[in-house]
A protein has these predicted regions:
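Histidine-centered active-site loop/cap adjacent to the catalytic His
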Residues: 70-71, 87-118
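Serine-dependent acyl-ester chemistry module
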Residues: 1-63, 67, 75-84
Length: 118
């Protein structure tokens, strides 16, 4: 399994990560309350994961999923097939970009759904 970075965070990064962790805790309360089986998918950008803050958020999401035994499709780890024309801006995909993502995640999504009996 992939290990997480142990880089030293500055105060702003710590604050941002802590706020994200709090949102994950609140989300987990709802997941458990309503007996939801979540499937998380990591976010990518047109230039990969050069955004340090996005990297930190994804790292926390992966830890959260591992700790709670939730499924996650780590799109950031399984593809680098995108170019600038697949995005309207740094994060929002065009129709072509969305189709690429769908083709990439579909096999894993089907596998997860079969595992949970859907």
């Amino acid at each position: 399994k992939k290990k997480y970075s142990n880089i030293e965070l500055d105060n702003q990064e710590k604050k941002m990560v802590l706020a994200f962790k709090d949102r994950l805790i609140n989300l987990n309360i709802q997941i458990l309350k309503y007996n939801i089986y979540p499937i998380f998918i990591t976010q990518i950008q047109y230039d990969g994961l050069r955004d340090h803050y996005l990297f930190l958020i994804i790292q926390e999401l992966k830890k959260f999923c591992e700790e709670n035994d939730y499924s996650i499709i780590a799109l950031d780890e399984i593809t680098s097939e995108f170019d600038k024309n697949d995005f309207y801006d740094t994060v929002h995909t065009t129709v072509a970009g969305s189709k690429k993502i769908a083709k990439i995640i579909y096999p894993t999504l089907v596998k997860i759904l079969k595992q949970i009996g859907l």
